[in-house]
Regions:
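Structural preference for solvent-exposed beta-strand-turn elements
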Residues: 1-366
Length: 366
């Protein structure tokens, strides 16, 4: 195999494809590599860790077709180190590949590409729809941080993608907080739902372009494809909890305040939070203010008071300050609404005038 590819294009492609190679030690060495295929369909880069996989096309000149597998990390380091514009040539001979440009050359040992598994492309038996890549990225990125990092309950370490009635939504929760993001997708008329491991979902949205993406899934796999690439991920087959049961239908207290004021007050209060990251959130009906108090015996204490439009009962709840801050960067509205349900019950945060995003957080023990 002999191929020539633009330096910048190859470096970018290798960087994105290497994300899907196996990072841990494995009995199948080729899983830690990138397979380069040069043939009638052009040049393709492939990688899989058996959880996720990618098949990406790249522009270049094929002087001699062939297939080769190279260590992903080493190839990424080499291709990212070439400066300037111009072409990189890869020439395969025996068990090595010579990578050369106008300024230097490297000889890299190959991996046994014959062991590379087939990347599955699911039949569209469960879901089949098209969506803008930029919309899909925003949908998943908005909720994925709320997924649990633990592997004890795989469903809580996942992002739920579901559709019904022309609306598609993404949901994630770690049982302490929950985020739901909805967008209108009129072309979707058949209900569906599937669970993607949150880590896989984040790798996918860091890779797909902003153009139209076709999404299709069966019971075990989901694929995201466009003319330049195809990505797959295994699905979590455990049922997702019925989170709608915990979303409050009514509230005892509601306050509307400026998002930036709330964020700044939380940032200052965090300095004085205790080892549990706790701050106390108070709603004063008489003073029309939301208060944030924090105390740390080693540092000191703080008291913040934010003017608010407020109604309902006076109430005080304790929260992990990081969980209160997390949704604020995801809300574009200037003002937010804090809706409390009572002692020991969840707080709902929304942007004013934005029904597409909901964030729910459970209070800490008083």
């Amino acid at each position: 195999m002999i191929i020539s590819i633009d330096k910048k294009e190859l470096a970018e492609a290798v960087s994105s494809v290497s994300r899907f190679a196996e990072r841990r030690s494995t009995t199948l060495p080729v899983l830690a590599g990138i397979v380069i295929v040069a043939g009638d369909d052009g040049i393709k880069l492939r990688a899989t860790n058996l959880e996720t996989g990618i098949d990406r096309k790249i522009q270049g000149t094929i002087k001699d077709p062939g297939v080769v597998a190279l260590p992903a990390n080493t190839l990424r380091e080499i291709t990212s180190s070439f400066n300037g514009s111009g072409q990189i040539t890869l020439e395969h001979g025996g068990d090595t590949v010579v990578i050369s440009s106008g300024t230097g050359r490297s000889t890299l040992k190959t991996l046994p590409y014959e062991d590379f598994p087939i990347i599955p492309f699911p039949e569209a038996t469960a879901a089949n729809f098209s969506i803008s890549g930029s919309v899909l990225k925003n949908l998943i990125a908005t909720v994925a941080p709320c997924a649990s990092p633990s592997t004890v309950r795989p469903e809580l370490g996942s992002v739920l993608i579901a559709a019904e009635g022309g609306t598609i939504k993404a949901v994630a929760t770690d049982s302490f907080r929950l985020a739901e993001k909805k967008v209108s997708l009129p072309g979707v008329t058949t209900p569906f739902s599937f669970l993607i491991p949150a880590k896989n979902a984040l790798d996918i949205i860091q890779t797909i372009p902003d153009e139209t993406i076709e999404v299709r899934s069966d019971d075990n796999q989901c694929a995201f494809s466009c003319p330049s690439m195809m990505l797959t991920t295994r699905l979590v087959t455990i049922a997702y909890p019925d989170y709608t049961q915990i979303i409050p239908k009514s509230f005892v207290t509601e306050a509307t305040l400026l998002r930036k004021d709330f964020e700044a007050a939380l940032k200052r209060s965090a300095v004085f939070s205790d080892s549990f990251q706790k701050v106390r959130l108070g709603f004063s009906i008489s003073e029309k203010r939301v208060s944030i108090n924090a105390q740390n015996s080693d540092v000191g204490d703080s008291a913040e008071s934010i003017p608010s439009s407020i109604s309902g009962d006076e109430i005080e709840l304790s929260f992990n300050h990081r969980y209160l801050t997390a949704p604020l960067s995801l809300i574009s509205a200037d003002s937010i609404t804090l809706s409390a349900c009572g002692i020991g019950r969840p707080l709902v945060i929304r942007g004013v005038g934005d029904a597409s995003f909901l964030y729910l957080v459970m209070p800490m023990n008083q």
